[in-house]
Structures are given as C-alpha cells and as structure tokens.
Amino acid sequence: MFSIDSCLKTRPLTFRIARLGMNFTTCSAARSYVGKKEIIVPKNIQFDLEGEQLQITGPHGTLNMRFPNYLNLSKTNDILKVGMDANIEKQATKKQRAMWGTTRAILANNVKGVTMYWQSIIKLVGIGYRTSLNDGNIHLKIGYANDILVSIPTDVQVENPTPTSLVLRGIDRQKVTQFAAKIRSFKKPEPYKGKGIYVDGEKPQLKAKRSIS
C-alpha cells in the first residue's frame, strides 16, 4: 500500500501504472479538461492507493473508490492532480478520457465529504404535514391515511430542526442525494397547490388552473 503523505514533500509524488493491451482512438480534448483540474486538499486528508483501489481518509470518515490503472495521482503541498502519462493521453480512447474526468469529479466529492460532509435539506409543504425521528426512522405525516415510515441508512445522519424540515448529512454525496430523492418520492410537489416534499431549495412549479366558461 502506498501513502502519499508518508513520502517526501520536496517533489511531487506520482503513481504510475504500466499500460497493457489497450486499444486507442481519437476524441475531443474537452473530455480531459475536468480531469486536469486541480483539487485543493486540506492537510488532514490521507490518501492510500493499492492497485485500482484508492482510499480517502479525513476527519469525518473513510471512503473507497476505483482508480483506473491508466491514470496517475500526484500531490504537491495542498494540490492534488489526476493525470495520464503523456504517451497514454495522446492516444486515449473516448471512454478513458471520460473516465478521467469522472474519476477526478468523484475524488473531489469524496475529499469534500470526509472533510466537511455533504448536506441536503428537506422541507414539507402542506397543511398538517409533519415529520419526526424515532428509533432510526423518519416518520412522515403527509396527507395519507397512515404515516410513512422511512428507515435511515447507517451512513447518513438526519436532524429534525423543525416539524416540517429535515437535514441529511453524510460523507458520500451519492448516498445523501439518493436518500433525499427517496424521501421526496413519497410526496412529489404537485403543480396546482404546491403541496409536497421539496429538496435543497427546490421551488414550486405551479400551473395556472383552467377555468370552465
């Protein structure tokens, strides 16, 4: 296992993996633009790369992600970069360039998650709509005959600051946003009165009622 932070800081550390048996085609250089963008990394973040598995550890926890072996990772002071060896980049396939940008985006999200959490805010809009927490579950009173009971995932934290709002937090952005979408699905905002469950500042998209003459 390699640890970036355990190595000398006098020069960039780069993990380079040999390229074997790849087929290459041309593609737009724009696909690699996102991949080349730098990531600002706090001092208390640790990276460990073993094979195609990259582990990111910070004050709020640890995340693991796939890191393709045709990419390399370098860190100088607080700057982290995802790159390709020059001879690979010249002939990289469209899929490889797309994965370069995707890998960089996921890595940036994971760094933010273990540093300061991802957050999603849920708001209930409707007369009598209420929500509460009990025994690891969210209770939703949203106009049905029975309350909706939603189990809280172990890797998502939930707060209930008001009777009509929830705050979701977690280190994994995808899990936080997926759970927010699940909660919203129980009462999607309706287009005439605006009742429903709203996520992250979502605004009502109201339709005008048609009059019958």
UniProtKB/Swiss-Prot annotation:
Keywords: Mitochondrion, Ribonucleoprotein, Ribosomal protein, RNA-binding, rRNA-binding, Transit peptide. GO terms for molecular function: rRNA binding; structural constituent of ribosome. GO terms for cellular component: mitochondrial large ribosomal subunit. Residues 1-32 form a transit peptide. Gene3D superfamilies: Ribosomal protein L6, alpha-beta domain. It is found in: Mitochondrion. GO terms for biological process: mitochondrial translation. Its main location: mitochondrion. Belongs to the universal ribosomal protein uL6 family. Component of the mitochondrial ribosome (mitoribosome), a dedicated translation machinery responsible for the synthesis of mitochondrial genome-encoded proteins, including at least some of the essential transmembrane subunits of the mitochondrial respiratory chain. The mitoribosomes are attached to the mitochondrial inner membrane and translation products are cotranslationally integrated into the membrane. Component of the mitochondrial large ribosomal subunit (mt-LSU). Mature yeast 74S mitochondrial ribosomes consist of a small (37S) and a large (54S) subunit. The 37S small subunit contains a 15S ribosomal RNA (15S mt-rRNA) and at least 32 different proteins. The 54S large subunit contains a 21S rRNA (21S mt-rRNA) and at least 45 different proteins. This is Large ribosomal subunit protein uL6m. The lineage of its organism: Eukaryota, Fungi, Dikarya, Ascomycota, Taphrinomycotina.
